[in-house]
């Protein structure tokens, strides 16, 4: 008995010491200030400053944000299609109830490993030259949650084009939108299927081609200098999609909600229902992210960006979130990035939204679904 008590004390002491160390790390970043001169840097000067003044992540010139746009800041920052990254007062009135669950939260979690049957979780899409991140973050997480709710039986890709072009309450299409409004639209109006431009599958595939975002020459054409105009809302499927009509192809949500701006609340929701849409503030240095755990180090604020949260972990004592971006697979860590967790870095823990698929609609589809996959590596 004494031995067990002694061992228990050791475990508790180790746990407390670990938490104390973690808090001291977080305090360092929570209370930091960005040097005023660093905040004004851009281009090679900013990249050099980032790489010389911290060791959590590396910066590298990204072709899309340098040679393509150059000084056209309006076009460059137009890709950041979220005006307000934090949940509004109204958005906080309807929060996920998973925050009240009694769950053991692991040190690390990855949706790709937890739900291996769901191919959509692994997919990186490309928003091209359109400020449609708010729509991509939404349909990506919705697609994942449909698969998870159906225990891997329904593998679908919801259409970013359908949401982007037809949700008038969401905002301004390629000029930005509201993530929570996108999830509410899913509940009220439903969203049809639609793959990326290259795969060209589903009812409404994405209308804009992938383009070169990156630091080295790729097989994609350079991104257009200006943003694409918002597509016209077409409430019909493309001509070569004959599986279902537009209305028959829709998937609906049962609920849409915000998630409390608390690390454990976010983790519980992610563990329970799957990937989430999150928004955060993008600074100039983030555009040049090439790997590691991102912390804002320099450069000016450009705008708000929406992405898909899939997990978390710790790297050499630094806690992070794992996130899927929509700038293709050659950006960052194969299209993903990691960002400091626990200090609301760039507001990333203050604008988390999600929802639940409408289960009765999923059940009826399971009886006639043929497991048609619409994923393609050629994004």
UniProtKB/Swiss-Prot annotation:
Gene3D superfamilies: Cysteine proteinases (3.90.70.10). Disulfide bonds join 118-147, 130-174, 166-233, 167-170, 203-237, 211-223. It comes from the Eukaryota. Residues 1-16 form the signal peptide. GO terms for molecular function: cysteine-type endopeptidase activity. CDD domains: Peptidase_C1A_CathepsinB. The active site is at 133, 305, 325. GO terms for cellular component: extracellular space; lysosome. Glycans are attached at residues 196, 201. PROSITE patterns: THIOL_PROTEASE_ASN, THIOL_PROTEASE_CYS, THIOL_PROTEASE_HIS. Residues 17-104 form a propeptide. Its EC number is 3.4.22.-. The keyword Glycoprotein applies. It is an enzyme of class 3 (hydrolase). Keywords: Disulfide bond, Glycoprotein, Hydrolase, Protease, Signal, Thiol protease, Zymogen. One of its GO terms (biological process) is proteolysis involved in protein catabolic process. Belongs to the peptidase C1 family. This is Cathepsin B-like cysteine proteinase 6. It comes from Caenorhabditis elegans. The lineage of its organism: Eukaryota, Metazoa, Ecdysozoa, Nematoda, Chromadorea. The gene is cpr-6.
